[in-house]
Amino acid sequence: MGGISIWQLLIIALIVVLLFGTKKLRSLGGDLGGAVKGFKNAMSSDEDKKALEDAEAAKSVQTAQTAQPTQQATEKKPESNKEQA
């Protein structure tokens, strides 16, 4: 009926085991698992790094906004010539 039955999958699995052997398949599975684990670790470390950078950027913006010194103009008025005499 067009689909692959369980018996066909078992026959394919048996042929693969006979061709490659269990040791080769075990090492291949371990390598594949290690690759998937490494990929997940890389993705999570990239997300952590991006979150850390976003937090630092937000903190620096907040610090810059609150730490802006207010400049007060303290102009010294020149003394007039009349007062000096």
Curated annotation (Swiss-Prot):
List, alphabetically, the InterPro entries matched: TatA/B/E, TatA/E
| HAMAP family, per database record | TatA_E
Q: Which organism is it from?
A: Shewanella sp. (strain ANA-3)
Describe the family membership recorded for this protein in Swiss-Prot or TrEMBL: Belongs to the TatA/E family.
Q: What does this protein do?
A: Part of the twin-arginine translocation (Tat) system that transports large folded proteins containing a characteristic twin-arginine motif in their signal peptide across membranes. TatA could form the protein-conducting channel of the Tat system.
User: What name is this protein filed under?
Assistant: Sec-independent protein translocase protein TatA
Where in or outside the cell it occurs: the entry states: Cell inner membrane
Q: Where is the composition biased (Basic and acidic residues)?
A: 46-57, 74-85
Single Gene Ontology BP annotation = protein transport by the Tat complex
State the Pfam families in the record. TatA_B_E (PF02416)
